[in-house]
Structures are given as C-alpha cells and as structure tokens.
Amino acid sequence: MRIFFLTFFLTFFLASVLSTTAFAGTPGEVGIGGYLRETTLDGLNGSSRKLSYFKGKPLIINVWASWCGPCRAEMASLERLAQRYNGNEFNVIGISTDDYRNKATAFIKQTGITFANFLDHRLLLENMLGANTIPLTIFVDADGRVLKKIRGAYAWDSPENIEAIGEVFHIKLKH
C-alpha cells in the first residue's frame, strides 16, 4: 500500500511539473495569477528603479522594441493613456527588448514618449513576463500579481479599451 501511494504521489508530482513546463512560454515566466519577482529596471528616459517601486497602484507594462512595427504603432496611444491618467489610477511603463540602448533611446526621443521606459538587455523581464512575441501588454494589480496579458497592438486610449482596462483593474475610469 505504501508503494502504491508513493507511486501515485510521484506520478502526480511529475505530471504537474511537466505540464507546467510544457506550457510555459518563456523560461521563468510568471503566469496569470502569479506575482512578479523583484528585479532592477534599467532606466531609458529616467532613473533606474526596482520593480517594487511601482507596487501600491495597478500597473500596465508594455513590452516593445524600436524595430517592431506594431509596437511603434501603439506607442502614441500608450503615451496618451499615461498622460490622461497621469499615474492617478494606474501607472504605465515600457520595457524595451532592443539589443542596443541607443536604438531604444532614439525611438523614445523621436516619438516624444514621456512615460517611464526601461531596457531589458539581460532578458530577465522578457522571460518573466512571457514576451516571446511583442508587443505584449501586461496588467498587474497593486500587489504585483499578473491579472492579464494581451498580445498585439491596440489603441489603448480608445473608449472601449479604457473601459476594458477599468474592468481588469476593477476601477471606474472616466473616458
């Protein structure tokens, strides 16, 4: 009987580990409902910060690269969203996956982006966020728990998307 329970436990344990690994998009990815791990963010248009700096308020993280056409297309709408809510209801940050800092900073300057952007040259955040495709936008609650991940470019400041953001964060946003 002992051998049966031991075999059952090991089989269940291995099945759960293998299924988790098989469906992970990137190594070390934090899935929906998981909590982001602490890491230092390398500032592109401002100071470097620890990820925990943004705790206490919902957070929208957009993963992008200067060479990515869809990323470039949605960046202006993210800027308008960030300016409209000005960190009052939530914060917006960008994570560049560019290989070269100068490419990312040139894009930020060219487009006039003012919300905080960081460089992920060691791919820690790209892996943690599951950014195997970009653009990727992640919604994180005030405690650092991942609520939703959306792949693809969107007009984030549209009335429909503002309403959807409010629903994800369980807050009422004015259009």
Where are the language model's segments positioned?
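Short pre-active-site segment immediately N-terminal to redox-active cysteine/selenocysteine motifs
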Residues: K57-L59, V63-W67, T133
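Thiol/disulfide oxidoreductase modules built on the thioredoxin-like
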Residues: A106-I113, D120-A164
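Bacterial N-terminal signal peptides
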Residues: T7-S19
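N-terminal "domain-start" segment that seeds a small globular fold
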Residues: F23-L51
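Conserved redox-active cysteine motifs that mediate thiol-disulfide chemistry
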Residues: V63-R80
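Positively charged n-region of N-terminal signal peptides that target proteins for export
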Residues: M1-F4
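Thiol-based oxidoreductase modules, predominantly thioredoxin-like and allied folds used
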Residues: E89-R101, F115-R122
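Alpha/beta-hydrolase fold active-site loops
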Residues: P58-L59, F90, P135, R145
